[in-house]
Amino acid sequence: AGFYGSAAWAAGRRKEQRILVLGDSLSAEYGLARGTGWVALLETRLQREKIAATVVNASVSGDTTPGGRSRLQVLLHKHQPTLVGIELGGNDALRGLPLANTRDNLAWMVEQSQATGARVLLVGMQMPPNYGADYARRFAALFEAVAKERKIPLVPFLLQGIADGPDPAALFQPDGIHPRAEAHPRMLDNV
């Protein structure tokens, strides 16, 4: 039910897709050569499969849900997407923003996207254990709650198989936060 599946389904109905990805550094190719991040790989995969789709990567390194919320209306109007992917929230947690605010911002962005007729995919994140088990659980649960309430698909953890894989250090840049280019095909498979 992710981007690829939705675009392939629509292609069968002969409708060109306009995919908007609103994310943070994990989607903005932070520290990578241009064209090697999962969003660029999505567009390449769709083209290879001859699925008519335009992918707009509106991701900004360091972005938070308040930042995404402030930019969303202009992006929806400008690009008129048929599919919207929201990959935000990780920086909210890293900055200590209240979880309730993150949840409310995500819900608002989903609602606004749905109001245009776009299908929405919510891309979740998880916090490392040093944030505490209770905080990590509540953080992951906010994505689940928004997806359930708005009846949209959820990718529970964009970095599944990367951050929790057998050798995560090998797949991350020296900062330990941003995946290397080698991890981005797996990230695409996750969405």
Where are the model-predicted features located?
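N-terminal export leaders
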Residues: 1-3
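Alpha-helical cap/lid subdomain in secreted, periplasmic
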Residues: 41-44, 51, 67-191
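Serine-esterase "nucleophile elbow" of acetyl-processing enzymes
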Residues: 9-61, 71-80
